[in-house]
Regions:
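Nucleotide-state-sensitive switch-loop elements of NTP-binding domains
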Residues: 3-50, 55-58, 67-153, 163, ...
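Conserved glycine(s) of the Walker
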Residues: 59, 63, 230
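Short glycine-/polar-rich loops that comprise or flank the Walker A/P-loop
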Residues: 76, 108, 160-163, 185-188, ...
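Alpha-helical scaffold elements adjacent to nucleotide-binding pockets in ATP/GTP-utilizing enzyme cores
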Residues: 94, 131, 156, 160, ...
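Conserved beta-strand segments of the P-loop GTPase G domain that flank and frequently precede/overlap
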Residues: 114-115, 166-169, 191-194, 222-223
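Inter-motif core of Ras-like GTPase G domains
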Residues: 133, 137-140, 153-171, 181-191
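Canonical P-loop GTPase G-domain recognition
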Residues: 189, 195-243
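Long, well-ordered amphipathic alpha-helical subdomains in the mid-to-C-terminal portions
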Residues: 222, 233-298
Length: 298
Protein backbone atom coordinates (compact mmCIF):
# COMPACT_ATOMS: atom_id res chain seq x y z
CA UNK A 1 0.00 0.00 0.00
CA UNK A 2 1.48 3.35 -1.03
CA UNK A 3 1.67 6.25 1.39
CA UNK A 4 -0.85 8.21 -0.71
CA UNK A 5 -3.38 5.37 -0.67
CA UNK A 6 -2.90 4.81 3.07
CA UNK A 7 -3.50 8.51 3.67
CA UNK A 8 -6.74 8.44 1.70
CA UNK A 9 -7.98 5.32 3.50
CA UNK A 10 -7.27 6.83 6.93
CA UNK A 11 -8.96 10.11 6.04
CA UNK A 12 -12.02 8.34 4.63
CA UNK A 13 -12.31 6.21 7.78
CA UNK A 14 -12.18 9.38 9.88
CA UNK A 15 -15.11 10.90 7.96
CA UNK A 16 -13.17 13.33 5.75
CA UNK A 17 -15.63 14.15 2.96
CA UNK A 18 -12.99 15.80 0.77
CA UNK A 19 -10.86 12.63 0.76
CA UNK A 20 -14.00 10.57 0.16
CA UNK A 21 -15.00 12.74 -2.81
CA UNK A 22 -11.54 12.47 -4.35
CA UNK A 23 -11.41 8.70 -3.86
CA UNK A 24 -14.78 8.32 -5.58
CA UNK A 25 -13.58 10.49 -8.46
CA UNK A 26 -10.47 8.28 -8.75
CA UNK A 27 -12.68 5.21 -9.09
CA UNK A 28 -15.20 6.82 -11.43
CA UNK A 29 -12.51 8.16 -13.77
CA UNK A 30 -10.15 5.14 -13.51
CA UNK A 31 -7.31 7.20 -12.05
CA UNK A 32 -4.01 5.30 -11.50
CA UNK A 33 -4.69 5.35 -7.74
CA UNK A 34 -8.13 3.76 -8.14
CA UNK A 35 -7.02 0.11 -8.33
CA UNK A 36 -4.57 0.20 -5.37
CA UNK A 37 -7.19 2.13 -3.40
CA UNK A 38 -9.87 -0.51 -4.02
CA UNK A 39 -7.43 -3.31 -3.15
CA UNK A 40 -6.72 -1.60 0.19
CA UNK A 41 -10.33 -0.95 1.23
CA UNK A 42 -11.76 -2.53 4.37
CA UNK A 43 -15.46 -1.82 3.79
CA UNK A 44 -17.89 -2.31 6.66
CA UNK A 45 -20.44 -4.67 5.13
CA UNK A 46 -22.73 -4.26 8.13
CA UNK A 47 -23.70 -0.79 6.85
CA UNK A 48 -27.08 -1.29 5.14
CA UNK A 49 -27.42 -0.25 1.50
CA UNK A 50 -30.94 0.73 0.48
CA UNK A 51 -31.82 0.88 -3.21
CA UNK A 52 -34.64 3.20 -4.23
CA UNK A 53 -36.07 2.78 -7.72
CA UNK A 54 -39.27 3.17 -9.69
CA UNK A 55 -40.83 4.87 -12.72
CA UNK A 56 -40.07 8.50 -13.66
CA UNK A 57 -42.08 11.10 -11.78
CA UNK A 58 -42.65 8.95 -8.70
CA UNK A 59 -40.91 11.48 -6.44
CA UNK A 60 -37.90 9.34 -5.57
CA UNK A 61 -35.56 12.29 -4.94
CA UNK A 62 -38.13 14.04 -2.74
CA UNK A 63 -38.59 10.81 -0.81
CA UNK A 64 -34.83 10.42 -0.31
CA UNK A 65 -34.68 14.03 0.88
CA UNK A 66 -37.39 13.34 3.46
CA UNK A 67 -35.68 10.13 4.62
CA UNK A 68 -32.41 12.02 5.09
CA UNK A 69 -34.15 14.63 7.25
CA UNK A 70 -35.76 11.99 9.44
CA UNK A 71 -32.55 9.93 9.73
CA UNK A 72 -30.27 12.85 10.61
CA UNK A 73 -32.76 14.02 13.24
CA UNK A 74 -31.44 10.96 15.11
CA UNK A 75 -27.88 12.35 14.74
CA UNK A 76 -26.90 9.50 12.43
CA UNK A 77 -24.82 9.78 9.27
CA UNK A 78 -26.11 8.92 5.83
CA UNK A 79 -24.61 8.74 2.33
CA UNK A 80 -26.69 9.17 -0.82
CA UNK A 81 -25.49 7.97 -4.21
CA UNK A 82 -27.85 9.48 -6.79
CA UNK A 83 -27.48 7.98 -10.25
CA UNK A 84 -28.62 10.48 -12.88
CA UNK A 85 -29.49 10.06 -16.55
CA UNK A 86 -26.62 10.73 -18.94
CA UNK A 87 -26.37 12.74 -22.10
CA UNK A 88 -25.74 10.23 -24.92
CA UNK A 89 -23.22 12.68 -26.35
CA UNK A 90 -21.00 13.79 -23.47
CA UNK A 91 -21.92 11.06 -20.95
CA UNK A 92 -22.49 13.76 -18.33
CA UNK A 93 -25.15 13.95 -15.65
CA UNK A 94 -28.22 15.90 -16.77
CA UNK A 95 -29.47 16.58 -13.25
CA UNK A 96 -27.27 17.00 -10.21
CA UNK A 97 -27.17 16.60 -6.46
CA UNK A 98 -27.31 20.32 -5.67
CA UNK A 99 -30.53 20.74 -7.66
CA UNK A 100 -32.22 17.61 -6.38
CA UNK A 101 -31.28 17.72 -2.70
CA UNK A 102 -30.18 21.31 -2.17
CA UNK A 103 -31.93 21.48 1.20
CA UNK A 104 -29.65 18.75 2.60
CA UNK A 105 -26.44 19.65 0.83
CA UNK A 106 -24.84 21.55 3.72
CA UNK A 107 -25.86 19.09 6.43
CA UNK A 108 -22.60 17.65 7.88
CA UNK A 109 -24.35 14.34 8.63
CA UNK A 110 -25.17 13.80 4.95
CA UNK A 111 -22.84 13.03 2.07
CA UNK A 112 -24.42 13.32 -1.38
CA UNK A 113 -22.81 12.16 -4.58
CA UNK A 114 -24.43 12.39 -7.98
CA UNK A 115 -23.05 10.36 -10.86
CA UNK A 116 -24.08 9.74 -14.45
CA UNK A 117 -25.35 6.34 -15.53
CA UNK A 118 -23.32 6.77 -18.76
CA UNK A 119 -25.70 4.57 -20.66
CA UNK A 120 -25.36 1.61 -18.29
CA UNK A 121 -28.20 -0.89 -18.44
CA UNK A 122 -30.27 -1.56 -15.35
CA UNK A 123 -30.36 2.05 -14.16
CA UNK A 124 -27.02 1.90 -12.35
CA UNK A 125 -23.81 3.74 -13.08
CA UNK A 126 -20.90 1.62 -14.24
CA UNK A 127 -18.86 2.09 -11.05
CA UNK A 128 -21.72 1.97 -8.51
CA UNK A 129 -20.52 -1.25 -6.84
CA UNK A 130 -16.98 0.02 -6.31
CA UNK A 131 -18.16 3.44 -5.13
CA UNK A 132 -20.52 1.80 -2.65
CA UNK A 133 -17.54 -0.07 -1.19
CA UNK A 134 -15.68 3.24 -0.85
CA UNK A 135 -18.70 4.66 0.99
CA UNK A 136 -18.75 1.61 3.27
CA UNK A 137 -15.20 2.48 4.34
CA UNK A 138 -16.46 5.79 5.77
CA UNK A 139 -18.32 5.97 9.12
CA UNK A 140 -21.89 6.06 7.76
CA UNK A 141 -24.88 4.42 9.40
CA UNK A 142 -26.87 4.06 6.18
CA UNK A 143 -26.25 4.28 2.42
CA UNK A 144 -29.03 5.07 -0.05
CA UNK A 145 -28.63 4.45 -3.78
CA UNK A 146 -31.26 6.20 -5.87
CA UNK A 147 -31.34 4.94 -9.44
CA UNK A 148 -32.37 6.35 -12.79
CA UNK A 149 -36.14 6.38 -13.20
CA UNK A 150 -36.55 4.02 -16.11
CA UNK A 151 -38.96 1.50 -14.63
CA UNK A 152 -38.54 -2.22 -15.11
CA UNK A 153 -34.97 -2.14 -16.49
CA UNK A 154 -33.63 -1.24 -13.05
CA UNK A 155 -33.32 -4.86 -11.98
CA UNK A 156 -29.55 -4.38 -11.48
CA UNK A 157 -30.21 -2.66 -8.15
CA UNK A 158 -30.70 -6.15 -6.66
CA UNK A 159 -26.99 -6.85 -7.15
CA UNK A 160 -26.08 -3.83 -5.04
CA UNK A 161 -28.66 -3.20 -2.34
CA UNK A 162 -29.48 -5.11 0.84
CA UNK A 163 -33.04 -3.83 0.54
CA UNK A 164 -34.84 -2.56 -2.56
CA UNK A 165 -37.67 -0.04 -2.30
CA UNK A 166 -39.90 0.45 -5.34
CA UNK A 167 -41.64 3.83 -5.40
CA UNK A 168 -44.96 4.13 -7.25
CA UNK A 169 -47.63 6.82 -7.57
CA UNK A 170 -51.41 6.41 -7.69
CA UNK A 171 -52.80 8.69 -10.36
CA UNK A 172 -52.49 6.82 -13.68
CA UNK A 173 -52.82 3.17 -12.68
CA UNK A 174 -50.12 2.26 -15.22
CA UNK A 175 -47.66 1.57 -12.42
CA UNK A 176 -49.34 -1.76 -11.75
CA UNK A 177 -48.15 -2.82 -15.19
CA UNK A 178 -44.60 -1.90 -14.14
CA UNK A 179 -45.03 -4.10 -11.09
CA UNK A 180 -46.29 -7.03 -13.14
CA UNK A 181 -43.57 -6.68 -15.75
CA UNK A 182 -40.49 -6.92 -13.57
CA UNK A 183 -40.30 -4.74 -10.48
CA UNK A 184 -42.39 -7.30 -8.57
CA UNK A 185 -39.39 -9.61 -8.45
CA UNK A 186 -36.99 -7.13 -6.87
CA UNK A 187 -39.03 -5.21 -4.29
CA UNK A 188 -38.60 -5.75 -0.56
CA UNK A 189 -40.98 -2.87 0.13
CA UNK A 190 -43.38 -0.75 -1.93
CA UNK A 191 -43.97 2.94 -1.37
CA UNK A 192 -47.07 4.61 -2.76
CA UNK A 193 -45.82 8.19 -2.81
CA UNK A 194 -47.89 11.35 -3.36
CA UNK A 195 -50.51 9.72 -1.16
CA UNK A 196 -52.42 13.01 -0.88
CA UNK A 197 -53.61 12.53 -4.45
CA UNK A 198 -56.97 11.08 -5.40
CA UNK A 199 -56.99 7.32 -5.69
CA UNK A 200 -54.00 6.71 -3.41
CA UNK A 201 -55.92 4.56 -0.93
CA UNK A 202 -57.53 2.38 -3.59
CA UNK A 203 -54.23 2.05 -5.44
CA UNK A 204 -52.41 0.91 -2.27
CA UNK A 205 -55.24 -1.53 -1.49
CA UNK A 206 -55.15 -2.92 -5.04
CA UNK A 207 -51.37 -3.34 -4.85
CA UNK A 208 -51.56 -5.11 -1.46
CA UNK A 209 -54.30 -7.41 -2.74
CA UNK A 210 -52.29 -8.29 -5.84
CA UNK A 211 -49.24 -9.13 -3.71
CA UNK A 212 -51.31 -11.37 -1.42
CA UNK A 213 -52.79 -13.19 -4.42
CA UNK A 214 -49.25 -14.00 -5.48
CA UNK A 215 -48.42 -15.14 -1.92
CA UNK A 216 -45.83 -12.40 -1.61
CA UNK A 217 -45.42 -10.84 1.84
CA UNK A 218 -44.14 -7.37 0.91
CA UNK A 219 -45.15 -4.25 2.90
CA UNK A 220 -46.90 -1.36 1.14
CA UNK A 221 -46.43 2.04 2.79
CA UNK A 222 -48.17 5.26 1.75
CA UNK A 223 -46.14 8.47 1.91
CA UNK A 224 -46.43 12.12 1.06
CA UNK A 225 -42.75 13.02 0.86
CA UNK A 226 -43.36 16.76 0.49
CA UNK A 227 -45.43 16.98 3.68
CA UNK A 228 -43.50 14.25 5.49
CA UNK A 229 -46.39 11.90 6.18
CA UNK A 230 -45.48 8.22 6.31
CA UNK A 231 -41.74 8.94 6.38
CA UNK A 232 -41.20 7.82 9.98
CA UNK A 233 -43.03 4.55 9.26
CA UNK A 234 -40.89 4.04 6.15
CA UNK A 235 -37.64 4.73 8.02
CA UNK A 236 -38.67 2.31 10.76
CA UNK A 237 -39.29 -0.39 8.13
CA UNK A 238 -35.90 0.33 6.53
CA UNK A 239 -34.00 0.12 9.81
CA UNK A 240 -35.77 -3.06 10.94
CA UNK A 241 -35.16 -4.94 7.68
CA UNK A 242 -32.99 -8.01 8.25
CA UNK A 243 -30.76 -9.22 5.46
CA UNK A 244 -30.33 -12.99 5.32
CA UNK A 245 -26.91 -14.64 5.08
CA UNK A 246 -28.05 -16.13 1.78
CA UNK A 247 -28.78 -12.66 0.41
CA UNK A 248 -25.40 -11.41 1.61
CA UNK A 249 -23.68 -14.25 -0.24
CA UNK A 250 -25.76 -13.57 -3.36
CA UNK A 251 -24.77 -9.89 -3.27
CA UNK A 252 -21.08 -10.67 -2.91
CA UNK A 253 -21.30 -13.26 -5.71
CA UNK A 254 -22.93 -10.70 -7.99
CA UNK A 255 -20.31 -8.12 -7.02
CA UNK A 256 -17.41 -10.47 -7.76
CA UNK A 257 -19.00 -11.61 -11.05
CA UNK A 258 -19.33 -8.03 -12.28
CA UNK A 259 -15.76 -7.19 -11.30
CA UNK A 260 -14.49 -10.23 -13.20
CA UNK A 261 -16.57 -9.23 -16.25
CA UNK A 262 -15.22 -5.69 -16.07
CA UNK A 263 -11.65 -6.92 -15.77
CA UNK A 264 -12.08 -9.13 -18.84
CA UNK A 265 -13.49 -6.23 -20.85
CA UNK A 266 -10.83 -3.74 -19.80
CA UNK A 267 -8.60 -4.49 -22.80
CA UNK A 268 -11.39 -3.83 -25.30
CA UNK A 269 -10.70 -0.42 -26.85
CA UNK A 270 -14.00 1.08 -28.03
CA UNK A 271 -12.34 3.46 -30.50
CA UNK A 272 -10.28 0.65 -31.99
CA UNK A 273 -13.43 -1.47 -32.20
CA UNK A 274 -15.26 1.33 -34.01
CA UNK A 275 -12.39 1.77 -36.49
CA UNK A 276 -12.31 -1.98 -37.20
CA UNK A 277 -16.08 -2.04 -37.69
CA UNK A 278 -15.93 0.95 -40.02
CA UNK A 279 -13.45 -0.94 -42.18
CA UNK A 280 -15.31 -4.27 -42.05
CA UNK A 281 -18.86 -3.07 -42.56
CA UNK A 282 -18.25 -2.21 -46.21
CA UNK A 283 -17.21 -5.74 -47.11
CA UNK A 284 -19.75 -7.97 -48.91
CA UNK A 285 -21.58 -10.35 -46.58
CA UNK A 286 -20.60 -8.52 -43.38
CA UNK A 287 -21.74 -10.46 -40.31
CA UNK A 288 -21.38 -8.84 -36.89
CA UNK A 289 -21.18 -12.22 -35.11
CA UNK A 290 -18.33 -13.39 -37.33
CA UNK A 291 -16.68 -10.01 -36.82
CA UNK A 292 -16.79 -10.38 -33.02
CA UNK A 293 -15.41 -13.94 -33.18
CA UNK A 294 -12.52 -12.79 -35.37
CA UNK A 295 -11.92 -9.66 -33.28
CA UNK A 296 -11.48 -11.63 -30.04
CA UNK A 297 -9.46 -14.45 -31.60
CA UNK A 298 -6.70 -12.09 -32.68
Amino acid sequence: MTEAVLSYIERIQSGDYLALARAISFVENEHPLAHPLLLSLRPDHSIPVIGITGPPGAGKSTLVNALCESFTDQKRRIAVLAVDPSSPFNKGSLLGDRIRMGKQFNNPLIYIRSMASRGALGGLAEKSLQITDVLKTAPFDLIIVETVGVGQSEIDIVGLADMTIVVLVPESGDEIQHVKSGLMEIADLYVVNKADREGADSFATKLSRMLKQKSVDIPVIKTDAIRGSGIDELLKAVLSFKRSNRLALNLLTEHAWRLIQEKRMKDVDRNELRASLEEAIGRPGFNVYQFVEQHFSR
